């Protein structure tokens, strides 16, 4: 029997484990401390978004939060639904081992089923709980998915401008990040540019709709043309190695009248990554999911690969408490009204002052053209007025 099987129950096993390590103590040789230079560089060069956000926290502490206008980090400005607090209160009555104990790695079965059933109600699908893998938010969903569908040396296409962490996660998976520019006038995905970016090394394409940072919502026509283009590319490849479409959807619920197409119904080789950070205003709680649709021809191999990636990356399980919250709040509507009012107020004022922009159809960002060539200099000067914005070259 493994020493660790009943470690919490048997002091004899603990003693045995401690004794068994003595022989190894003399095997260590003192040498120079080594660090991973890539990780050092990533940590030393913190995200410009996080850097501006941290600066904002300092200024708020110095002059008061009401005097700082922080448009940096994507923190929802609306509170979580009241049902979230009610669910937490209910969960706190559970026995400690149920409330705080580990869940199965893919998530609580009842939570996975709740997600699948919610998707079925909304999109007319036939998913099951086993098609859902609960994660520590969208970042974990993306990193697990990337590591599941790629091999070192592969290429992953992103639609520029894009969330800057995509490159970090792609490169950590040993892959090359390849940019395909969006249409400059509408920020719709450019199928022609994606086609130009495809090579025999392409393993996946990441799309983000509603888009961060532009607010564009990709139309059904755009996505259908993309799907057809990917199928044409797949026809020249090993049928067991199609190009995967990774649909990153943390902003799906935050739209202003636009329709967000359900991508797996358009392209069969799709994996969906989702987070409740925006829809339920829970960014600090880190809970989301990966959907491997049962309509994906590679599903039988993809889900074990996702589980293996989560294990390898050190994601033990999604937060137990908030999996229970998701069960209770799965169909709670997002409060889009406040974002819609902000969008109207900002766009009206910016237009009055001579700024140009593409009006966002979703998410809660505004991509504005500065009135000068250097966006970094513009954002730096804006700090004098306690206005914090992120320069576009960060994306």
Short names for language-model regions:
Residues 6-50, 60-93, 106, 110, ...:
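PLP-dependent class I/II
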Residues 57:
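Charged, glycine-enriched surface loops/patches
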Residues 98-103:
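Short, surface-exposed loop/turn segments at secondary-structure junctions
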């Amino acid at each position: 029997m493994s020493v660790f099987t009943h470690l919490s129950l048997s002091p004899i096993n603990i003693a045995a484990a401690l004794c068994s390590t003595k022989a190894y103590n003399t095997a260590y040789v003192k040498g120079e401390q080594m660090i991973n230079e890539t990780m050092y560089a990533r940590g030393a060069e913190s995200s410009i978004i996080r850097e501006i956000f941290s600066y904002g926290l300092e200024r708020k502490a110095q002059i008061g939060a009401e005097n700082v206008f922080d448009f940096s980090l994507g923190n929802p400005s609306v509170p979580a639904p009241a049902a979230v607090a009610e669910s937490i209160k209910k969960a706190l009555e559970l026995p400690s081992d149920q409330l705080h104990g580990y869940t199965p790695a893919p998530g609580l079965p009842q939570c996975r089923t709740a997600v699948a059933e919610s998707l079925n109600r909304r999109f007319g699908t036939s998913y099951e709980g086993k098609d859902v893998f609960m994660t520590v938010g969208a970042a974990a969903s993306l990193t697990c998915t990337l590591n599941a569908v790629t091999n070192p040396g592969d290429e992953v296409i992103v639609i520029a401008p894009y969330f800057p962490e995509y490159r970090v996660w792609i490169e950590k998976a040993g892959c090359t990040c390849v940019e395909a520019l969006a249409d400059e006038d509408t920020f719709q995905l450019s199928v022609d540019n994606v086609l130009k970016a495809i090579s025999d090394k392409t393993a996946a394409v990441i799309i983000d709709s509603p888009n961060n940072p532009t607010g564009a919502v990709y139309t059904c026509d755009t996505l259908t043309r993309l799907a057809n283009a990917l199928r044409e590319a797949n026809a020249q490849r090993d049928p067991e190695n199609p190009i995967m479409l990774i649909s990153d959807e943390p902003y799906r619920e935050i739209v202003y009248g636009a329709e967000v197409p359900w991508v797996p119904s358009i392209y069969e080789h799709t994996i969906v990554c989702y987070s409740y950070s925006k829809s339920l205003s829970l960014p600090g709680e880190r809970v989301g999911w990966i959907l491997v649709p049962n309509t994906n021809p590679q599903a039988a191999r993809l889900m074990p690969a996702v589980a293996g990636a989560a294990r390898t990356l050190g994601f033990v399980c999604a937060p137990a408490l908030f999996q229970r919250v998701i069960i209770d709040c799965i169909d709670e509507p997002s409060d889009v009204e406040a974002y819609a009012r902000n969008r109207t107020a900002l766009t009206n004022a910016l237009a009055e002052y001579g700024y140009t922009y593409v009006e966002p159809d979703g998410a809660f960002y505004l991509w504005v053209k500065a009135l000068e060539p250097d966006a970094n200099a513009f954002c730096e000067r804006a700090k004098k007025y306690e206005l914090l914005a992120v320069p576009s070259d960060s994306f």
